[in-house]
Amino acid sequence: MNPNQKIITIGSVSIVLTTVGLLLQITSLCSIWFSHYNQVTQTNGQPCSNDTINYYNETFVNVTNVQNNYTTITEPSIPQAIHYSSGRDLCPVKGWAPLSKDNGIRIGSRGEVFVIREPFISCSINECRTFFLTQGALLNDKHSNGTVKDRSPFRTLMSCPIGVAPSPSNSRFESVAWSATACSDGPGWLTLGITGPDTTAVAVLKYNGVITDTLKSWKGNIMRTQESECVCQDEFCYTLVTDGPSDAQAFYKILKIKKGKIVGAKDVDATGFHFEECSCYPSGENVECVCRDNWRGSNRPWIRFNSDLDYQIGYVCSGVFGDNPRPVDGTGSCNSPVNNGKGRYGVKGFSFRYGDGVWIGRTKSLESRSGFEMVWDANGWVSTDKDSNGVQDIIDNDNWSGYSGSFSIRGETTGRNCTVPCFWVEMIRGQPKEKTIWTSGSSIAFCGVNSDTTSWSWPDGALLPFDIDK
C-alpha cells in the first residue's frame, strides 16, 4: 500500500470512528431524555424527591441529579395574625426591676428633644414604645415658653422606642391630641386622640395610622381619656373616657373597639365615684383599671369589666393611700372615697391586684409630686388597715415625680402563661415648681420579677435652669 493509500485509509477510519462516537453521544442523550421523561410521568402526584441516577454506556459514565419537581402552582401562604388573648393572670412578683430610662431632660439641654408631658408605654408583640403628648416645641427653644398649659392646638400624640429621648429624628406622629391612649391588639396599633375646644372636643380613632372612627364629647366638659395604654384581648380593645367636672360628679363610658371601630359602649353608673386617667391591665378574662379621684378621694377607685362590658366598681380598700395629696396612712374604705381634708385634686396613678393583696405605686410626699415607691399590702384589696408588707424605693423624696401608670407585657411575647405587670413614672421638670419658662418630663419604667431586686433612687437628674430660662 503506497503512502497515499495509507493516508486515505487512516482518514477513512478516523471518520468512521468519529461518526460512531457521535452516534453514541446522540443515543446516550436520547436515552437520558426518555428516561427522565418516563420517570416524571410515572411519579406525577407523588411527593418531590431528589434522586441520583447513573447512566452507563461504552463511551462514558454520566451521573445526573434529577429533581422530581414537576410543575406545581402553589398559592403563597399568608401567616395568621396573632392577636392578644385573654385568660392569663398576672405573673407572680416579688419586686420591680428597671426596664428603661430615657433621660430626656438631661439630653435635651443640648439636643433636639421634644417638650412633652403625659408619657406612657405600650407594647406590641414585637416592640415596646413610649407614647407622649408633645407641645409642638423643643427643649431650650423659644417655643417652649408657656408649655405648662394642658390643652392647646399644638399638642400631638407621638411615639418612639422605649429608653430613648423623644426627638424629631426618632419619633413617629400618631394623632393630634391633648389627651390620648394607645394599645396594640397584636397585628396593629390603635390610637385614640382627643383634641378640640373644651366644650366640643372630639376623639379620633386610628388603626395602623388610618382614621377609623370618631367620638364627640357627650357632656361638653373636657372629654378626656386614660393617658396610659388601653387593653386589647381576643381581637377587641377597651378604654375608658370621662366627660364632666374634674371636681364634682362626672360621667364615664367604657368603649369596646375592633380594628379602630367602636363596636360597643356602656355608660358607667357611678354616683359618688370619680374616675379619671385610669391605668388598666388584663386580668384573666377581664380588664381591671385603677384610676384617679380628683373630686374627694385619697384612695383610688377601681373598675373591672368583661368583654360584654358588665362591670364592678369600688375603691382600693387599703389604708395605704395611693393618691396625692393624701393624709397619713390610716383607715381605708372599699366602697367610698377617703377624704380627711386631702381628697381633692390628685395625680394619675396605678395599682396591681393579686387576690386579696395589692401592689400600690405612689409618691413619697404627702403633698407634692415628689419621690416614688412601690408598697406591697398583702390584704390591701379587702382590708382597710394600714399594714404593709414591704416597700421598694424608686425615686427619693428630694426629686420630682409626676404621673405614673401601668402597662403589661403579654404571654404572646414572653412565651409565659401569665402577663408581666409593668409601670412607668413621669418625672416632671420646670414650671410650676422650678424657675423655667417651660414644663416637660422624662420617664423611667419597671417590670415585675419573681427574683431579687433593689431599692435606690433613679431621678430625672437634669440641672436647671437652661440657657433659654436665663
Curated annotation (Swiss-Prot):
Catalytic activity entry: Hydrolysis of alpha-(2->3)-, alpha-(2->6)-, alpha-(2->8)- glycosidic linkages of terminal sialic acid residues in oligosaccharides, glycoproteins, glycolipids, colominic acid and synthetic substrates
Record InterPro entries: Glyco_hydro_34, Sialidase_sf
Modulation of this protein's activity: Inhibited by the neuraminidase inhibitors zanamivir (Relenza) and oseltamivir (Tamiflu). These drugs interfere with the release of progeny virus from infected cells and are effective against all influenza strains. Resistance to neuraminidase inhibitors is quite rare.
Membrane topology annotation: Single-pass type II membrane protein
Post-translational modification: N-glycosylated.
Domain notes: Intact N-terminus is essential for virion morphogenesis. Possesses two apical sorting signals, one in the ectodomain, which is likely to be a glycan, and the other in the transmembrane domain. The transmembrane domain also plays a role in lipid raft association.
Record's subunit section: Homotetramer.
Protein name, per record: Neuraminidase
Organism: Influenza A virus (strain A/Grey teal/Australia/2/1979 H4N4)
Gene label: NA
